[in-house]
Amino acid sequence: MHLSSPALPIGGFSYSQGLEAAIELGLVHDEASTLAWIESQLVTVMARAEAPLWCLLFEAWRAGDDAAAHGWNQWFHASRETRELRQETEQMGRSLARLAQELGWGTAATRAAVAALRPATLPAVHACACAMWALPREAGLGAYVFSWLENQVAAAIKGVPLGQMAGQRMLERLRAGLPAVLADARARAGATPPRLDTFAPQYALVSARHETQFSRLFRS
């Protein structure tokens, strides 16, 4: 619960992951189009790449395989196609790593392994924190994906803008699809080799457009 809290001081509230640019371009303009956008990102970006990668990172940390964890951390960083997306995961990963250090999560050796990540990405540090706490993989993965969903909905409420009830309706709809998304992520992570798919050209294009957008509330 702690790791999925919107009060976690890692700056998630300041990012929209391209949603603000989609609003500016008219791709997102009301509750229905917002729901369609977030659902699309959930199944084409999160379920196919970031969530299964989180599983691989979690298993590496739990097995004490620092080399594998560092390798998947670098893979994720390289897969971020725009400067804003790279800066986002770097900043949030760095902030979560600092929190883990200051609160003394896990062992000194594990904290040192996290500190050695160059750069630390959010899924790598989040997966390590869950492994430090000996959380079940399903619980940690669910917390990671749901916190992403909440952040997307919160960004839409501010950016479209939408009302609070619209946000809750969207969360209810999106939450109903989470079991299938998590199952897909686990299956992709368990394949040999892992079936990671980062093909999301529209996501990359709107993120790139956001870098030069005239008026912005969010950092991505």
From Swiss-Prot:
It is found in: Cytoplasm. One of its GO terms (molecular function) is nickel cation binding. The keyword Cytoplasm applies. Keywords: Chaperone, Cytoplasm, Nickel insertion. The keyword Nucleus does not apply. Its main location: cytoplasm. GO terms for cellular component: cytoplasm. Belongs to the UreF family. Required for maturation of urease via the functional incorporation of the urease nickel metallocenter. UreD, UreF and UreG form a complex that acts as a GTP-hydrolysis-dependent molecular chaperone, activating the urease apoprotein by helping to assemble the nickel containing metallocenter of UreC. The UreE protein probably delivers the nickel. This is Urease accessory protein UreF. It comes from Bordetella parapertussis (strain 12822 / ATCC BAA-587 / NCTC 13253). The gene is ureF.
